[in-house]
């Protein structure tokens, strides 16, 4: 399944875009597509709220991390304010995704270099 970001109205991929892709490329009706996308993200959210990791092969891992309490400071007044401990979600991209991102970045760099050689420096 392949699509380009250029075909999107905004460069961000949204749940609505994902549902539209299921509708167009898999053949689900629009209601089923939306329900499937919503169920997918609800499942991920539920696991994270439970404090469990979410591992998506070839994409990456979502993990819950507890940040320790620490001293903070109000930037306007300089007053010391304690920051309480909290849970945060972290994402670590898989090696495969990192390689794909680096490959596309290198491809873009090579293209820019080709244009720079033909037309002078790229500014």
Curated annotation (Swiss-Prot):
HAMAP family xref list: IHF_alpha
Family: Belongs to the bacterial histone-like protein family.
UniProt signal peptide: none
Keyword tRNA processing: no
Protein name: Integration host factor subunit alpha
Protein purpose: This protein is one of the two subunits of integration host factor, a specific DNA-binding protein that functions in genetic recombination as well as in transcriptional and translational control.
NCBIfam families cross-referenced by the UniProt entry: himA (TIGR00987), PRK00285.1 (NF001401)
GO biological process, one term: DNA recombination
GO cellular component: cytosol
The organism of origin for this protein: Polaromonas naphthalenivorans (strain CJ2)
């Amino acid at each position: 399944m392949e699509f380009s970001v250029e075909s999107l109205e905004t460069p961000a991929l949204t749940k609505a875009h994902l549902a539209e892709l299921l509708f167009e490329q898999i053949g689900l009706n629009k209601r089923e597509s939306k329900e499937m996308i919503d169920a997918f993200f609800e499942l991920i959210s539920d696991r994270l709220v439970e404090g469990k990791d979410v591992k998506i092969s070839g994409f990456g891992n979502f993990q819950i991390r507890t940040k320790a309490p620490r001293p903070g400071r109000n930037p306007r007044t300089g007053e010391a304010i304690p920051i309480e401990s909290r849970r945060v979600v972290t994402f670590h991209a898989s090696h495969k995704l990192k390689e794909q991102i680096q490959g596309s970045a290198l491809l873009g760099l090579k293209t820019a270099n080709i244009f720079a050689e033909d037309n002078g420096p790229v500014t």
